[in-house]
Amino acid sequence: MCAEIVLGTISNTKEAVNWLSYTYLYVRMLRNPELYGISEIDKSDPMLVGRRHELVHAAATLLSRSNMVRYDKLAGTLQSTALGKIASHYYIKHQSMQVYSENLKPHMSQIDIFRLFSLSKEFSLVPIRENEKLELQKFVERVPVPVKGTLDEPATKINILLQAYISRF
């Protein structure tokens, strides 16, 4: 939804509810309502307008908390922010943008910047394997910026790999 707000396709909740009717999610909700927490399709709302409005409100609230959009609940308007544009263009998850928004400061050290980006949601499923620890230890000695954390933390592994990639060793 953030990308659609950035593109200008969506500027208010009414347009967002309408846009949602063109998605695969909507088709699946109609075909298999139980899977999406809809006990049965209400005869008074067969097109799930109420449910779509709930989803739009929840998504807009979440994006607003992450500072990716400005959401005026009373007027129903949605407006993109600089963070929303960045997230949309680079496919960054809202959880990562929220971490950046809350923790990125004007005068951070390189150590803290690498640590912050290594905490991105996109890297959360990267495992630490026992057979990698020796190699990571060798890398940690060669990276240009000191690494905070232990080799048992996925964020530390990501930090090391980011620096290794950037410094091309």
Residues of each region from the PLM?
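C-terminal helical accessory/scaffold domains
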Residues: 4-7, 13, 17, 43-52, ...
